[in-house]
Each structure stands twice: as C-alpha cells, then as structure tokens.
Amino acid sequence: MLRVLHRAASALVMATVIGLAPGVAFALAEPTSTPQAPIAAYKPRSNEILWDGYGVPHIYGVDAPSAFYGYGWAQARSHGDNILRLYGEARGKGAEYWGPDYEQTTVWLLTNGVPERAQQWYAQQSPDFRANLDAFAAGINAYAQQNPDDISPEVRQVLPVSGADVVAHAHRLMNFLYVASPGRTLGEGDPPDLADQGSNSWAVAPGKTANGNALLLQNPHLSWTTDYFTYYEAHLVTPDFEIYGATQIGLPVIRFAFNQRMGITNTVNGMVGATNYRLTLQDGGYLYDGQVRPFERRQASYRLRQADGSTVDKPLEIRSSVHGPVFERADGTAVAVRVAGLDRPGMLEQYFDMITAHSFDDYEAAMARMQVPTFNIVYADREGTINYSFNGVAPKRAEGDIAFWQGNVPGDSSRYLWTETHPLDDLPRVTNPPGGFVQNSNDPPWTPTWPVTYTPRDHPSYLAPQTPHSLRAQQSVRLMSENDDLTLERFMALQFSHRAVMADRTLPDLIPAALIDPDPEVQAAARLLAAWDREFTSDSRAALLFEEWARLFAGQNFAGQAAFATPWSLDKPVSTPYGVRDPKAAVDQLRTAIANTKRKYGAIDRPFGDASRMILNDVNVPGAAGYGNLGSFRVFTWSDPDENGIRTPVHGETWVAMIEFSTPVRAYGLMSYGNSRQPGTTHYSDQIERVSRADFRELLLRREQVEAAVQERTPFNFKP
C-alpha cells in the first residue's frame, strides 16, 4: 500500500546555463554540497519515493524487488495510460481492446510469436530477476488499484499486468521494432517515427579533461509523439546499487544510466539483425534448393473490437518457411523474416547487470552474454576507462555486403540461410583509444575515435556500410578531437553546438556565384548568407533560407552527395564532402529557395526562432538547433510549417545528460518534453523553456540534494 504525503518544497539550487552563441562561457551553479562526498550510495532503511520539482521519482528501496516495485508505481503514475496501451499491444490483444487501428500490429506480433515467446522468456529469467519483473508489474497494478480514476477507461481492461507482460513489451520493442519491423518486412518502409531514430554519445578519458575525470554524454533523439519511444527519468537506490538516468516507458531497467562509479549510453546502429527472404511460391509451397517444400502451418485467431463494443473472432493462419514466419505483401509476393536473437531471453537482466557493474571487467562479462540485440553502447567510469561497442546479435553470413542483406534476399537457396551469430569480440570495438575519446552519432562504426584504430577491412562487409558519415557525425568527431582540457562546463557548451557544417562546406562557393547574378533578389540573399554566422540560433535571419536551399542542393533529407564538388571519402571521413560542383545550378536553386522561403515563412530573413517554436500546452518559446544532416550536433527535426509559418519539433533531443565522474559525480541534463504525460500532469511542459535557453538543471543523486528539492513523499510497503 502506498500513501502520498505533501509538503512545501524547499528551495532547489539549479544549474544555470547562460548564453546560446558559440564561444559564450557556460556558468553552473555551485554544487549543492561540499565535494569529496563518499562514493557509497545512501542505504535506505525504508521504502519511499521522493518526487522532486520536475516530477522525477527518487525511489529508495530496502532491496531490489522493492525498488522495482516503486519504479513500476512511479511509471504508472507518470505514464500509466500509455504503458497499459503498450502492454495490451504486446500481449497481441490490441485489436481486441481497441479495434481495427491495431489489427496490423496484432497480426504482426502473433505471426512472429511474440506473446507466446514472451511467456517462455519470462519462465527462463533467473529467479532473482524474475522477482524484480514481478515487482515492477505489481507496482503498476498497485498504482492503478489505488488510483482508479487516474487510469483511462479505455486501458483499464489491460489490468492486471504481469511480469510476462513486461517481457513481452521489451521483446516487441527490441526485436520487432528496432531489429525487424512490419514496414520493412511488408515492403512499405518504416514510418518517420521509426526511420528517423538517432542519438549522440561521447565518452572522454581523464587525460583529455581539465580535472582528470572521465566525462559522458547521453543524448537520444527520437520521436516526440510515439508512445514506445517516450523517455522517463528516474533514480533508483537500494543498499546494493544506485541507478540514475532515463529509459523508454514500460521498461523496468534504465538503459541510459549512470551512478557514482560508471555510466552507459546507447545510439541506434545500422546492424542488420533481421533478413527478409523473397520466396518463390509453387504448388502451395515454396522452392528451396530445387525442391518444393510445404509451409509449416498453424491455425490461430484473434478478436477484433467492433464500433459497437462487441468483438468478432478472426482466424489467422500462420505460415512458416525454413527461414521464419511468412508475410504476404500488397503486390502478392511472399516474404519470410528471420530475426537474430530470438533464443536470447536475457536482454533486460543484461542491461541491469551492465549498469550495476562494480568494475569494467564485470561490465565486459555482462556485455559478452550478447543478449542485447542491437545498439552502439558507450561506457565511461570513474577509474578512467572508456569504451565503444558496435553491439548486437549479428548473423554470420557467407557472402554479400550490407546492402545485399538489407534488401530482399533470395529464399530459394540454402546458401543464404544463416544459422550462427558473431561473438562480441568479432564486432568493432575500442577501449581507451590514444585519441582520448569515443563517440557515435549513428554513423557506421569506422570513426568511433580519432585517429581511427581499425578500418572496415578488419571486419566483414555485411556488418556495417562504408557509406558517407552524416555531417552531424563528422561534427561529433571534430568537437571531441579538436578540444582538450575539457571541463564539464565546456563539455556542455560543445553538446549545444548547432553549427550548420554544410554551410561551411558550400557557402564559400555559392556566395560569390550568387553575388554576380543579375537578379537583385539573389544578390540580396547572397548578402544575407554572407552575414550569417552559420549557426542555427533563434535569432538567425539566414538559417531558414539556407535550409530551403540545402534541401534543393542535397535532397529532401539533406544527405545527397552528387552536387558537392568533392564527395565523401572514407580516406577523409570528417572533412568531406565539400564544395559546389555546379555553381550556376546552385544559384538557380537559391533562386527557387528564395521563393519557397517566402511562401512558407513570409520572408527570407525571418528569425529562425520566430518560425521554429517549442510549444507544449500553454508554453510557446523560440527554438534553436536544426537537422543533423546539415551538421547541427544538437538536433531537432521540425514539422512542416502551418499557414502562419510556425513549425514545432516532431523528433530530436529528448533526454540529455552530461556527467563528470568526479567525487562525488556531477551531472546536468533535461527531459525536453517533461517527465509525465498523464492527463492533468504539471510535468509535461515544465522543462521546455529550459530547453529553449539550454538551461540545464542539476541531476540530483545525493540524498541531501534530493531532500532539499523534494515536493512530495510516497512511502510504500512491498511484500512479494
């Protein structure tokens, strides 16, 4: 039973970041207590949740199950409706609960065996970790039982949830959204919220910092509107472990995590862990090695909710080939999907063991289990070790490069059927490189540090592409390689970089050509671009025009190479492409961009932040930062402008944390869209003004910090 006690909040000492322009020093508040606090975490003697002024739960448990229970209770309070909907979907009952809009997801999950496999995986958990999963689910149920009016009637039917539901949601998210997805298998392509995943990560060794302390950046970029990509900030403390950070809602472990000893972060990588096999149908079966094989067939069914609230049973025949489950595309072709890692139930426990490791050796032992199916993972600790791993369950393939395996692979020959996967040591990794840092911004794993320590020739060509690194990824390498003696303050300033690297690479050729064009409007635009500091700041008057020109020059996603004078090269991965191949064509594109900018925004010199707005509830503030493919390290992807030329973020910076492994640890960060989306919450729009100002708040780990900031206490008792 939980009860909630309210009291007036004490004054909260926040970190304040001052200034947006490059070169302006970032000033932080003094630490809230004297340095040299002991590394040992506070050891709770009772179970309670202390809520700070931003709705962050600081969960103190007398043991691990108690902390997991409190974590489930806190997530339900902050995101209960969305979590229950996600759990209902992962159960394979979305169509039954909510109707036709969920039918495709239901069929996708049932055909791939997700609900059934989740039950098996739940049974295969270690007893201790299964108890943690049960406790997390019990916390969700307890909150809903104690606060029934706070849960939407639409999702109450999902209750109660179980530890198996927790596993099912994680399994669906990792294996059947990140690794395999319905859009890729059905040939429709991923929707933007799934296709545009991204993140930034840095880890810096002590020798590259001013104070001799390692530094870590956590910075995922995902959709702001998609439930399963919504992040949640929390702090868990027991006598045996401490974890602070953020993770997607519904997950019982924190994936972007740190404590007084170490931390990790993740970025989406391009590992191809799923293969779509194109089948040749014949005589009711499929061709394989010159013979017709029958499909394995299994009869199943699901219920579909009707408009009047009734349900009808829908039969579902599940066909499988030797490769895996079979799906029919809209054009009538049959495709079988084979997903690596479906024999590995331990992803959640591996993450938990990674983020509670007592040494780098312990961390490596957890990583070597290879239960986490994808992601680049970056590590740093207070002893000074840093590591980058191109992690994932990667099939061993006899031939073909990554482009071949990303496509529709012939399914009529056993030569393409993979049955084994690579161990961790086969994958691109680097520990404590000479350059003193590791990084990843969703680029292929060939420049995780600078100078590089390995090349693509050291690895199979199907592991990762040798394709152009984005300008954001190039900027990531340069921001780290060109800065030494880093303080936490300077580290934070670099994270806020919103320089238009593409402008640096192209304007020296475009501007002179435009200045001699006879069109006065083109000349005026050239002068505007020449006066621009090439930063996506809120007061920039040329950024919108440049963005429109760059879309014509480099394509809709700003990733095209053909128009550059010098294209990208693996030999010069952080300084190419550059130059304008055809200045006359580029000037004509500028002429078109002038018209497009006027049509969309009313003028070519409208301030960037006047059009790019951060709007949540009744908060409406100017935005800064731009598209990663234009070179902005700090990323926001903007919606199409409305009739007033106003656009808002649809994707980009969500959680950001910058950590110094000092004694005690210092950390600052923000959750762009707040820490709750339940109806009536005050913690949805309460951080967006700080995002606009890059005004990072101190993240509170030490008990005395939390006590000084507490707004509400929730004592609880938990008995398994």
From Swiss-Prot:
The active site is at S199, H221, E653. Residues 188-198 form a propeptide. Its EC number is 3.5.1.93. One of its GO terms (biological process) is antibiotic biosynthetic process. The keyword Signal applies. It is found in: Periplasm. GO terms for molecular function: glutaryl-7-aminocephalosporanic-acid acylase activity. It catalyses: (7R)-7-(4-carboxybutanamido)cephalosporanate + H2O = (7R)-7-aminocephalosporanate + glutarate. The keyword Nucleotidyltransferase does not apply. Heterodimer of a small subunit and a large subunit processed from the same precursor. Catalyzes the deacylation of 7 beta-(4-carboxybutanamido)cephalosporanic acid (glutaryl-7-aminocephalosporanic acid or GL-7-ACA) to 7-aminocephalosporanic acid (7-ACA). Cannot efficiently use cephalosporin C (CPC), penicillin G, or ampicillin as substrates. This is Glutaryl-7-aminocephalosporanic-acid acylase. It comes from Brevundimonas diminuta.
